[in-house]
Amino acid sequence: MATAASNPYLPGNSLLTAGSIVHSDAAGAGGGGGGGGGGGGGAGGGGGGMQPGSAAVTSGAYRGDPSSVKMVQSDFMQGAMAASNGGHMLSHAHQWVTALPHAAAAAAAAAAAAVEASSPWSGSAVGMAGSPQQPPQPPPPPPQGPDVKGGAGREDLHAGTALHHRGPPHLGPPPPPPHQGHPGGWGAAAAAAAAAAAAAAAAHLPSMAGGQQPPPQSLLYSQPGGFTVNGMLSAPPGPGGGGGGAGGGAQSLVHPGLVRGDTPELAEHHHHHHHHAHPHPPHPHHAQGPPHHGGGGAGPGLNSHDPHSDEDTPTSDDLEQFAKQFKQRRIKLGFTQADVGLALGTLYGNVFSQTTICRFEALQLSFKNMCKLKPLLNKWLEEADSSTGSPTSIDKIAAQGRKRKKRTSIEVSVKGALESHFLKCPKPSAQEITNLADSLQLEKEVVRVWFCNRRQKEKRMTPPGIQQQTPDDVYSQVGTVSADTPPPHHGLQTSVQ
């Protein structure tokens, strides 16, 4: 590196050409390689050779267009190697290509072939682009960053999506912004090389072009900004949009998630986030929403089956009419509400109390409970109608239930005899009740209950402040009333007044 041949800053250095150190921007998206000398001071036509005797780069050509000419330290390092290989700088170019992975090797080979076809040089002279540590202005030597070189593999090549940085991230400044001007001498060759490189990269990297499969782990890198494909500097897409629009040049494969420093888990699926025109199926990694809103948990009315559909649900008018008919039929058949509740429990397994049947007949249950009870009562009515006139299970069930004696209707004559006896003796003995029952041809229990009810009625009729008098006392007082002593109720009225 101390020899004159390896010093890139001498104006008469014969080892450097514009094509080997010039890197295009996004508008051209290509590497070096041109028929005439670049910058504005090189040789014209096909005269720019790589022999020591030809001075392709002069001081004026080097300093003529600093915005379109960039010199890389890795290119300078090849000067000494070129001097030891017969004066040809590109003797190790194809060795670097073979050391790359298959996708980058194919892209680099395609770019080299395109440059050879469009350039009079004997080799695919495309200079290597530097890492983001190179300075914006080429004259001063760029600082040596903490980039780790990979030996024979030349991991400092930084081929587009080819090699992964093994060392710490670069600490140097980012690459300069894309340039807008190119010397006309090598623009065509650079554009051809860029197109070939982009096509080869798209063909061998389906995960970037179509987004159908994730890239290998070795294709991930963390280089922000531009990167290189076989020495050609490629910047992020220009005004043409993602993928290189009109004048956009080669497509930038820098993933925005990698620039932002996302986690490796997200970087694995970065092809889903890349801007491309091809549709791709959604990946399970991005389906972070709720599991499902349909199917088993579709919502109310969809997954829950109502036992009574809209057609079977009766209206309030139907329930009212049925309750009225049910009560009439039940009384006609001679069954009590308790009998119906017991029969429903024995026949259908649903035991209902007498209160429930009473509330159903009075329409005092909720609409839901009325709808549930209606079909059961309807079945009971059908069973009771079919068994009319013959003892069936319903009759047996009613007999097994709580026995309730029918209300006894007492004739007027019999009732008068009982009333006269009550005035004489409101609380007869058991023997007197038996004799009275025999004389009136009534059951003993009926006579006993009548006297009990009559005494309760007498208590309700007598005010609590007045001492209860027996009928004999009342009759005797009525018979001995004189004009001087008013009846007791008159005194009451006087005291009230």
UniProtKB/Swiss-Prot annotation:
Can fully replace Pou3f1 in Schwann cells of embryonic mice and rescue peripheral nervous system development in these animals, although severe defects in forebrain development are still observed. It holds the Pfam family Homeodomain. Transcription factor that acts synergistically with SOX11 and SOX4. Plays a role in neuronal development. Is implicated in an enhancer activity at the embryonic met-mesencephalic junction; the enhancer element contains the octamer motif (5'-ATTTGCAT-3'). Disruption phenotype: Neonatal death at least 36 hours postpartum. Loss of both Pou3f3 and Pou3f2 leads to abnormal formation of the neocortex with dramatically reduced production of layer IV-II neurons and defective migration of neurons. Residues 311-385 form the POU-specific domain. Brain. GO terms for cellular component: nucleoplasm; nucleus. Belongs to the POU transcription factor family. Class-3 subfamily. The keyword Phosphoprotein does not apply. It is found in: Nucleus. One of its GO terms (biological process) is metanephric DCT cell differentiation. Residues 465-483 have a biased composition (Polar residues). Its main location: nucleus. Gene3D superfamilies: Homeodomain-like, lambda repressor-like DNA-binding domains. This is POU domain, class 3, transcription factor 3. InterPro entries: HD (IPR001356), Homeobox_CS (IPR017970), Homeodomain-like_sf (IPR009057), Lambda_DNA-bd_dom_sf (IPR010982), POU (IPR013847), POU_dom (IPR000327), POU_domain_TF (IPR050255), TF_POU_3 (IPR016362). It comes from Mus musculus. Residues 32-51, 240-250 have a biased composition (Gly residues). Residues 133-145, 170-180 have a biased composition (Pro residues).
